[in-house]
């Protein structure tokens, strides 16, 4: 009997831990961390301090988890109204809103403290600004009131590379703001592809996402426009900023070409949810691989290999007889 009670208590404890973990929407966080890490690698010329990297990513994780938890508290009414989200911790009754608020505050305080003590004040303030912008501007002011909610609100998701850059340098350069702009421009096609998939859910709770207000065809047209803007804009890191080189250029060309192709497919069939799902999934892969390209391009080893290839080519050219 005692053993059974212990097992039950352990199971209940694990269920509580799982519920609080779910409040943070953990599937969203890795992409934010990847953009943070990419900025740190570029800012450090491929020689980022591993301890600084780990501390910054941990602080970023805590800040993002706090923001998502606060979002769950604010949106508990629409989460309960939608069948897809009714099982989330707060609408299902597994976590009380007050307890979730305390949890979110603890996460934010830990994040801020970690940044201030082990990184710098600039990164700490930027991380907190991300939480504030996400909650006040996107969640409170825009999400339920404007079909342009994700366009402006996307700035919150664009802050992580600023945090990463500031963690390394203590300030922000044009390259840091270029990374911010790339993610800002990428967010609408990424999120609207998702909104096309779950349009009915948003309509049910009167959230004016673009597909609900303007319809699928207009939304896809906007996705097409933003894609045609963001893909060429990614090359600003190469010229004129010279923050990235040939490896990143090749990666951005291939990934951008596929991004445009998938958006074009959806443009031909704007009502096709499978194509919207395919674009949504690819947009995640696109950003992950684009950031990976930034990291690889920044490494000293990459520069040495490119220089060696260039020297070998020059040697071969010099051996060609001229007549």
From Swiss-Prot:
Gene Ontology process terms (BP): heme O biosynthetic process
Organism: Gloeothece citriformis (strain PCC 7424) (Cyanothece sp. (strain PCC 7424))
Entries under InterPro entries matching the protein: Protohaem_IX_farnesylTrfase, UbiA_prenyltransferase, UbiA_prenylTrfase_CS, UbiA_sf
Protein name, per record: Protoheme IX farnesyltransferase
Tagged with keyword Transmembrane: yes
Function (record text): Converts heme B (protoheme IX) to heme O by substitution of the vinyl group on carbon 2 of heme B porphyrin ring with a hydroxyethyl farnesyl side group.
Superkingdom of source: Bacteria
EC class of the enzyme, as a word: transferase
Subcellular location: Cell inner membrane
GO CC annotation: plasma membrane
